[in-house]
């Protein structure tokens, strides 16, 4: 089939690689290059880098709603669109272009976690199981009927990053299994139950601010769900520190009380339970083991950490 692939981050690369092996990619549509890092150097999306390495034609439109992209893609006479974490909502004129429709690989079991950050919110909300859904796209936000789904467990130490690395190839395999049924018209569609829908909006930096008044299990899920971005943050001796690799450990204390260095890292009491962070990163410093950091920045046990958002 003649396919236009929409995608941007690393998560979308396995799906593009799989489709390119079996079908003709007539265009790869991805986000524009954007400044990144302290130097503000332009960085290309992972999908663009992969596509160029494979000799695939790349489009990076600044706008998708002015009709220009729809006209360009219509001229390519695509059979269908495959959309994987593109990062923009496609307007009706684009959705109407492919003969066999636009299809999305969404990283949740729809209708749960509709939106831009389904992997992150599944971890933050403490879900035990998630998955990927192949969905026929329509104008609503991830509201289209499902063609296929596959499930995966969320492991106790999963971060959003590690979970994404497992879901990406799972989605690619499910897509390859589903495309033949789309092509021959035998695909069976299941309408979503909108009453059961939950949302997964884009994350903001505030979503990483930890509140140790919450139970340790809630703090742990939040810290893992915002890893790698925006990162879990706490106020440590007046500085905003990022913390990583949480483990729930035995102990007790006041919420926000530093209990000292344990085998799993810096231990901090929560509303109920205790959490230990194995690695810490101070502003302008590299991420390092808690033991190494505390050797140069000792914290007296019994210290009560301040809150980034005191409300």
What do the predicted segments below correspond to?
Residues 207, 212-311:
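An anion-binding loop in the catalytic cleft
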Residues 1-42:
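N-terminal Rossmann-like dinucleotide-binding module
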Residues 2-4, 26-29, 57-76, 81, ...:
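Internal alpha/beta domain cores that form substrate/cofactor-binding pockets in large enzymes
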Residues 13, 17, 70-74, 176:
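Amphipathic, non-transmembrane alpha-helical secondary structure
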Residues 80-199, 204-206:
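Donor/substrate-binding cores of folate-linked one-carbon enzymes
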Residues 7, 28, 51, 81, ...:
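A residue-level signal for conserved active-site and pocket-lining positions in enzyme catalytic cores
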Residues 30-36, 43-62:
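Conserved nucleotide-sugar phosphate-binding/catalytic loop shared by glycosyltransferases and other
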Residues 13, 41-44, 66-70, 88, ...:
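Structural motif corresponding to alpha-helix initiation and N-cap regions
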């Amino acid at each position: 089939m003649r396919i236009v692939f929409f995608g941007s981050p690393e998560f979308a690369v396995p799906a593009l690689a799989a489709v390119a092996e079996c079908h003709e990619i007539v265009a790869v549509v991805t986000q524009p290059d954007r400044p990144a890092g302290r130097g503000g150097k332009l960085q290309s999306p992972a999908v663009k880098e992969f596509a160029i390495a494979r000799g695939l034609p790349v489009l990076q439109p600044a706008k998708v709603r002015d009709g220009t992209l729809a006209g360009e893609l219509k001229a390519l006479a695509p059979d269908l669109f495959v959309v994987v974490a593109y990062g923009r909502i496609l307007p009706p004129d684009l959705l109407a272009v492919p003969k066999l429709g636009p299809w999305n690989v969404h990283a949740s079991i729809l209708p749960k976690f509709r939106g831009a950050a389904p992997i992150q919110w599944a971890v933050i909300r403490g879900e035990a199981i998630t998955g990927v859904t192949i969905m026929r796209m329509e104008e609503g936000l991830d509201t289209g009927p499902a063609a296929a789904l596959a499930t995966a467990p969320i492991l106790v130490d999963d971060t959003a990053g590690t979970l994404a690395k497992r879901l990406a190839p799972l989605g690619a395999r499910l897509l390859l299994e589903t495309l033949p049924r789309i092509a021959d018209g035998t695909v069976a569609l299941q309408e979503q139950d909108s009453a059961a829908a939950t949302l997964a909006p884009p994350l903001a930096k505030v979503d990483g601010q930890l509140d140790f008044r919450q139970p340790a299990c809630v703090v742990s899920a939040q810290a893992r769900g915002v890893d790698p971005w925006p990162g879990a943050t706490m106020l440590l001796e007046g500085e905003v520190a990022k913390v990583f690799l949480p483990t729930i450990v035995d102990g007790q204390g006041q919420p926000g009380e530093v209990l000292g260095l344990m085998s799993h890292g810096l231990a901090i009491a929560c509303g109920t339970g205790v959490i230990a962070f194995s690695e810490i990163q101070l502003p302008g410093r590299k991420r390092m083991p808690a033991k190494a950091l505390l050797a140069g920045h000792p914290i007296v046990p019994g210290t009560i950490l301040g809150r980034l958002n005191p409300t």
